[in-house]
Amino acid sequence: MLLTRAGRLPAATERALRDLRPTRVYVLGGEQAVRSEVLARVGEILPGTGVERVGGENRYQVARKVAERFWSSSRGAWVASGRTFPDGLTGGAAAGRGGFPVLLTRSVAVAPDAGQALLELAPTRVTVVGGTSAVSGYVGLRFGALVGDA
């Protein structure tokens, strides 16, 4: 995963893309999060590389769309707070290593996009990342109930 600014590709990210020479680049986030100019710049520095946006109206929807784009089903899923990024970012590495999607939720209620993604993916296990101030115990229990692991 490489990071960018909303309206400009940082030099370090540009160097990493040149070094990695991927055949496909996925840009996560809607137009407000990552503007079209950034996608165009990726196309300029990597001619012939496919550049695809996976966007949505908000971060919760983007996480669901990423799960839909890359997983038709999954044995497990990881859930993190959509309000702060550290838990989702660090949990994402572990989830990715296991081949699991990361969904985002609200602290005190299951985000509808996360609940919908779980119904579609039909995992048998959900791992909640972060403490109860990030994702309440109640929300953790609701996720467990959604996958029959209550």
Where are these regions (language model features)?
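Extracellular glycan-binding segments that recognize GlcNAc-based cell-wall polysaccharides
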Residues: 1-150
